[in-house]
UniProtKB/Swiss-Prot annotation:
GTP binds at residues 166-173, 191-195, 213-216, 283-286, 314-316. Residues 1-159 form the Obg domain. It is an enzyme of class 3 (hydrolase). SUPFAM superfamilies: Obg GTP-binding protein N-terminal domain, P-loop containing nucleoside triphosphate hydrolases. This is GTPase Obg. GO terms for biological process: ribosome biogenesis. An essential GTPase which binds GTP, GDP and possibly (p)ppGpp with moderate affinity, with high nucleotide exchange rates and a fairly low GTP hydrolysis rate. Plays a role in control of the cell cycle, stress response, ribosome biogenesis and in those bacteria that undergo differentiation, in morphogenesis control. Residues 160-333 form the OBG-type G domain. InterPro entries: G_OBG, GTP-bd, GTP-bd_Obg/CgtA, GTP1-OBG_CS, GTP1_OBG_dom, GTP1_OBG_dom_sf, OBG_GTPase, P-loop_NTPase. Monomer. Mg(2+) binds at residues 173, 193. Residues 128-148 are annotated as: Disordered.
């Protein structure tokens, strides 16, 4: 399936049905009074996050989504039928943005999350609502309200724990295929990866994390060179970035120069992404003679000016990969625990202790300023 991570759509909720002015006409009740029913509610449009969908391709070719109008009211106190709502299923990680003013309407981060994106119009009132002690035969009625109409921009940011950075042919796709169930296209030419790939890395039956591989960056990507930086937003939700470097490039380019170019483009794109935790992964050690490895690694780290974690691997032979995966999971586990602790509010803590609130006059408690 073609990977599409951007789309523009128009959503039109249904109009409410009109109320009706009607009077009861039955045998022996020639002046039975008003009995006009209300109009039905127009259909609304909802966005629903679905983990079984991983692309916005359906919305690239289906741009207009319109809900049905509510039915008009009828006599004999018959109300119009409300229209059914429409649910648009989107990938988890989709941002829904108003295309006119740039307002962020919703961020779909959880499977099954539902967000109202266009509200259906309310039905109009029938004349039965306008009856009063001074107006026994009202002829007033009201029309149904118009449904909301919006132009939306959908942007997909994949949800992953780990993001891979690197030049084309650095071995990112080989690495993700070595440690996960992902099977991206792998070849010996640049820009083999044309769209993000996700893989689930399983450390054990109950321990896993998600890793994202995006197309390689080159110098000048922020100015549109290569595939540009259009896919970098997929790394914004990650907890950790792995900067993969080809330590044995076939064209004899300087790995340090290429690594610095990646960092430069990252900073140009987004300071927050640049400040995200980053580990250095030196790949293709199987291509470096055994006696030169230590010297080449040391020289690279010194010239690159790197002071963070460093891992030496060969994605092709899987050398060093299991150790790296273990370190990644340990790091992710700590991050997840920290996030869970930060989500605990004082109210949650009190509820866990069986205390809903503290009465200042309760002698069991002493308030310390």
């Amino acid at each position: 399936m073609k990977f599409i991570d951007e789309a523009k759509i128009e959503v039109i909720a249904g109009d409410g049905g009109n109320g009706v002015a009607s009077f009861c006409r039955e045998k022996f009740r020639p002046f039975g009074g008003p009995d006009g029913g209300d109009g039905g509610k127009g259909g609304s449009i909802w966005a629903v996050a679905d983990r079984n969908i991983n692309t916005l391709v359906d919305f690239r070719y289906s741009k207009m989504h319109k809900a049905r109008d509510g039915e008009n009211g009828r006599g004999a106190d018959c109300y119009g039928k409300g229209a059914d709502d429409i649910k648009l299923r989107m990938p988890v990680g989709t941002l829904i943005i108003d295309n006119n003013d740039g307002e962020l309407i919703a961020d779909l981060t959880e499977h099954g999350q539902e967000v109202l994106i266009a509200k259906g119009g309310e039905g109009g009132w029938g004349n039965i609502h306008f009856k009063s002690s001074t107006n026994r035969a009202p002829r007033q009625k009201s029309e149904g309200k118009e449904g909301e109409r919006r132009e939306l921009r959908l942007e997909l940011k994949v949800l992953a724990d780990i993001g891979l950075l690197g030049m084309p042919n650095a071995g990112k796709s080989t690495f993700i295929s070595a440690v996960s169930n992902a099977r991206p296209k792998i070849a010996d030419y640049p820009f083999t990866t044309l769209h993000p790939n996700l893989g689930v890395v399983r450390v054990s039956h109950e321990k896993s994390f998600v890793i994202a591989d995006i197309p390689g960056l080159i110098e000048g990507a922020s100015d549109g060179a290569g595939l540009g930086i259009q896919f970098l937003r997929h790394l914004q939700r990650t907890r950790l970035l792995l900067h993969i470097v080809d330590l044995a490039p076939f064209d004899n380019v300087d790995p340090v120069k290429e690594a610095k170019a990646i960092v430069k483009e990252l900073k140009k794109y987004d300071e927050s992404l640049f400040d995200k935790p980053r580990w250095l992964v030196l790949n293709k050690l199987d291509m470096v003679p055994e006696e030169e490895r230590k010297k080449r690694v040391k020289d690279f780290i010194k010239r690159f000016g790197w002071k963070g974690p460093v891992f030496e691997i060969s994605a092709l032979t899987h050398e060093g990969c299991s150790e790296l995966v273990t370190e990644i999971y340990d790091y992710i586990a700590v991050q997840r625990q920290a996030e869970q602790r930060s989500e605990e509010t004082p109210q949650m803590v009190e509820a866990a202790r069986g205390i809903d609130s503290i009465d200042p006059d309760d002698p069991r408690f002493k308030i310390i300023d």
